[in-house]
């Protein structure tokens, strides 16, 4: 069988088409280049050049950097119909060499391939983190004339914490790795032991958008372009822009469930590692799901700021000072114990607080701020239909909020039982969200709050300008109509 050495020390059979996954985004303006995004699958058609491969994605073919992709470990899923079919691979984690031969049906060999890939990618990832911390961050700290502490915090987030965590994680992986028989390695327990540590990725992922915006502003100055490029060359890093390196942790945390799912696929149920890998897969799926959910919440904070700006007579702190998610909203009757009057209000339940609003009597789409309830101080009490002696009212579809410190009580009446059930479910969801946020230290940064406020101000100005233009246009139109009536032929002035 003929072997051709490809990029990154990989060996590929000369008559084979293999599949590779993009590790980095590749943007190209070249006529014969092929562009792709991280996660895309590329068919490698020619790997005879060490640095540049020829490949196909969808219907497009072209050249791309070999260092931007990784070959699939187990390529046996390809259909065996000829010499150009996808071949099976084996990756030696010590030499980083992927050898592609004939398909093997041996489950142990397949498991060894996945184990070896996990070990190899972890070692490469550690190097990327080291390059970021020592090649970029360390050099930036030396240039106080170019970077403030706040800027570096925004750009790099908690990358050093991630680096320290990953070094400890990889050390434990190495202890679990069986060099002689990789398929016997038991790495599932390692993920379970470190599961709480992976939550530090949440802070990094939540900050990543701010990092990109800050870098984008700096890169408008050629000094920063030259500085970051000099850092890359000095550290002997691959030809990727700094924003590409900073994206790596975001990509990495999302890859763990995929790798563990593949490992579980090739782990026999009687293998000593099976139940641990299955548990690790569930844990890492939950971690990535929660991180993605929190990232989505941060992307929606502009909407919360815009909503608050639309509420008239607002008092007190901004919603974003404590909350980041609207959980439920609805209209209910409400009685507050000291007054005992039944009032109709619109309630907006956020994490940590519930805002009370009153609709305008004429313009029902206009809301007036009427107060808020600190959900951290209250407990929810489900009430059966009947008479309440404390409030001296008949109750149906009711529940109470009881202040555990002051003994204050709020009584609520939903219009229907189904609505009451939805509210009770929403309160449980609110408490669960708060507990999970506290566990991983989730919060909105001051920079993100400022950004949301700026977005609202910008939108208000644009709306104001549009309104003025519409009014001016309407006045001009009316003036023209008047003039036309005054000076039309056959009519006296």
Curated annotation (Swiss-Prot):
Detected in brain, throughout the gray matter. Detected at low levels in heart and skeletal muscle. Coiled coil: none annotated. Keywords: Cytoplasm, Guanine-nucleotide releasing factor, SH3 domain, Synapse. Residues 110-294 form the DH domain. Residues 107-117 are annotated as: Interaction with GPHN. Interacts with GPHN. Acts as a guanine nucleotide exchange factor (GEF) for CDC42. Promotes formation of GPHN clusters. This is Rho guanine nucleotide exchange factor 9. It comes from Rattus norvegicus (Rat). The gene is Arhgef9.
